[in-house]
Amino acid sequence: MEDFVRQCFNPMIVELAEKAMKEYGEDPKIETNKFAAICTHLEVCFMYSDFHFIDERGESIIVESGDPNALLKHRFEIIEGRDRTMAWTVVNSICNTTGVEKPKFLPDLYDYKENRFIEIGVTRREVHIYYLEKANKVKSEKTHIHIFSFTGEEMATKADYTLDEESRARIKTRLFTIRQEMASRGLWDSFVSPREAKRQLKKDLKSQEQCAGLPTKVSHRTSPALKTLEPMWMDSNRTAALRASFLKCPKK
């Protein structure tokens, strides 16, 4: 699974996922299913934001290419992927500026058009079950919830899906592609089933013990695209960098 994650996702996303797991004392090399889930969630958050802007009249528009000097503001602020201190700094700044109620838990995005925080969910289970779990955790009608599944289903607060149909279809297609690529490598069942994942983990740990004495080569590359997660007022090229996040999984 770890090899699949590193091949399938943009290096920026992989680095952010590794950083997030290490912040909580988790090892991406051991908890590989969680590693894959975090990368998937990060990519969906970026895709949710990509190409969506607010023009000088305050209208929401979609721009895939055009004048980089146009008076456009990113519609969504990406909170997911930042370290907790910076994430709360951004949330507090948004609340102080807009007057929106501060959430109890860190959300994933902020929508400047609808003036609301958004919690994004990506589930391997039934969307309505995961939606209820999210709603029970958030416990706030002010935070909008939007759930996607790997089967193309989705569910959102008050059936308000925020994005246009084409943007949502792009996310669903990407999730379906990830599922197909996992299945073709024999990884999907363990990704979905905790019991199978536990069995696979024991197998991986045993394999690591056998290979402990072998030399390894490690890359310490740092992606310049990490700058795209600076606060919006510090960022000038976010859209171009985020487009690189939506790479297709390579063919086997």
Curated annotation (Swiss-Prot):
GO molecular function: RNA binding
Entry keyword set: Decay of host mRNAs by virus, Eukaryotic host gene expression shutoff by virus, Host cytoplasm, Host gene expression shutoff by virus, Host mRNA suppression by virus, Host nucleus, Host-virus interaction
Native source organism of the sequence: Influenza A virus (strain A/Turkey/Wisconsin/1/1966 H9N2)
Site entry: Important for efficient shutoff activity and nuclear localization: 195, 198-199
UniProt remark on domains: The probable endonuclease active site in the N-terminus and the basic amino acid cluster in the C-terminus are important for the shutoff activity. The C-terminus acts as a nuclear localization signal. The C-terminus is recruited to host protein complexes involved in nuclear Pol II RNA processing.
Main location: host cell
Residues annotated as site: Important for efficient shutoff activity: 202-203, 206
Active-site residues annotated for this sequence: 80, 108
Bilayer-spanning residue ranges: none
Role of this protein: Plays a major role in the shutoff of the host protein expression by cleaving mRNAs probably via an endonuclease activity. This host shutoff allows the virus to escape from the host antiviral response. Hijacks host RNA splicing machinery to selectively target host RNAs containing introns for destruction. This may explain the preferential degradation of RNAs that have undergone co- or post-transcriptional processing.
Protein name: Protein PA-X
Domain of life, source organism: Viruses
InterPro entries, per the entry: PA/PA-X (IPR001009), PA/PA-X_sf (IPR038372)
GO BP terms, alphabetized: viral RNA genome replication; viral translational frameshifting
Keyword Thylakoid part of the UniProt annotation: no
Family recorded in the similarity comment: Belongs to the influenza viruses PA-X family.
UniProt-annotated location(s): Host cytoplasm; Host nucleus
